[in-house]
Amino acid sequence: EWTPDSKTAVATMGADDFRANEQSVTLPAADVLTIEFTDEDGKTTVLKEGLKVLKGEVVDGTFMSAKALDAFLAEQVKRAKEEGILFSAHLKATMMKVSDPVIFGHVVKAYFSELFEKYGEQLAAAGLSANNGLAAIEGGLDKLDAETAEGVRAAIAAAYENGPDVAMVNSAKGITNLHVPSDVIVDASMPAMIRTSGRMWNKDDQTQDTLAVIPDSSYAGVYQAVIDDCKANGAYDPTTMGTVPNVGLMAQKAEEYGSHDKTFIMDAAGTVAVKNSAGETLLSHEVEAGDIWRACQTKDVPVRDWVKLAVTRARASLSLIHIS
């Protein structure tokens, strides 16, 4: 049961993320695009070429600031500790297989900040990346000398002791939300949390109010709105309120679902630009080292079919349809 005094909440960036920085253009004619990066010294590198687009196709570009992400995450670790609630991260590391493991790595580094400040170089030299989660780091400690490995273990223990409790995937086995990038997927984890009164499992195998960290604000808002409603009016009961089917736009690698080959982790500061075959700049962003930049394509036909499908399903089921 939900109560008005629940401390559960969603934390999202709201600025300097994919949603905030998005630019888009609808192509007036078929074309072939190029994605270029120009560094601060004026050197240009082609990131992607031969990008074929059709008339009416929507192309968008955006980026998430690594610096803003790190500041946001540090604040959320502090907030969860101060409020006495679980710290949890909710991403799409399976579907968004290029960007989200990197974001997950930032989350791991934020929680275990002192670990990476002290042993980050040694871990990197041993091929142990935060992007793969805490389990991969703990499993690779044999690649370090005994003294360093023991220091890493101590730093991990200290982070747990001094930081907020972390939501668990398996309390009995000590597997946290930060162990494996793909263990907690937002589409499944957030509805599950909401169904359990906004709580997740802690290390003592008890449910506890939770801070759900969803860095990109593109889809964080809907979960906060549901949480606010449940706090005010109680848990949802589908048997009395019904359901709303979701019709997503995914066909022909639409939107972010086709962004994998157009996602880049920036090595340096500069400008990323999307240009047409005439060399004209359609989209551009000023980026810094570590920023995550991506482009998406959405063809005209899938958009039309998507809306048509939603209308058809709504008529057939006599229900509301949510399109996203």
Regions found by a protein language model. Give the residues of each.
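Conserved small/polar residues in nucleotide/adenosyl-binding loops
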Residues: 321-323
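Extended, well-ordered protein cores
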Residues: 1-105, 114-319
